[in-house]
């Protein structure tokens, strides 16, 4: 099955502590979760590891967010949108349901 949200897509958060924020998908996990830049930040207490050149301290990093809590952002309408699939010239392409434009 083709993925409705893919890497490099701009998404908007629909639910949770970061509701309303936008970000770019940096990674799609096989568990149905996404890692979005600047969204769902957590503080991780990092141990120093001189062999790997890692300094210790408190590090902020992005945690995975459930894919059902985000929607793809349609820049033409300025709102969250749904994605559909159709065939054009023998290729399967994604399009926005609200205005039928192709997802870039």
From Swiss-Prot:
Keywords: Ribonucleoprotein, Ribosomal protein, RNA-binding, rRNA-binding. SUPFAM superfamilies: Translation proteins SH3-like domain. The keyword Cell membrane does not apply. One of its GO terms (cellular component) is ribosome. The keyword Ribosomal protein applies. Signal peptide: none annotated. Pfam families: KOW, ribosomal_L24. GO terms for biological process: translation. HAMAP family: Ribosomal_uL24_B. Part of the 50S ribosomal subunit. One of two assembly initiator proteins, it binds directly to the 5'-end of the 23S rRNA, where it nucleates assembly of the 50S subunit. This is Large ribosomal subunit protein uL24. The lineage of its organism: Bacteria, Pseudomonadati, Pseudomonadota, Gammaproteobacteria, Alteromonadales.
């Amino acid at each position: 099955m083709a993925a409705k949200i893919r890497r490099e897509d701009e998404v908007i958060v629909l639910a949770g502590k970061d509701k309303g924020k936008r970000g770019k998908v940096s990674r799609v996990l096989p568990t149905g979760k996404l890692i979005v830049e600047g969204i769902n930040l957590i503080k991780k207490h990092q141990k120093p590891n001189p062999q790997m050149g890692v300094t210790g301290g408190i590090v902020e990093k992005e945690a995975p967010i459930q894919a059902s809590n985000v929607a793809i952002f349609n820049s033409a309408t300025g709102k969250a949108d749904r994605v559909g699939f159709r065939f054009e010239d023998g290729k399967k392409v994604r399009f926005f349901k609200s205005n039928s434009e192709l997802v870039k």
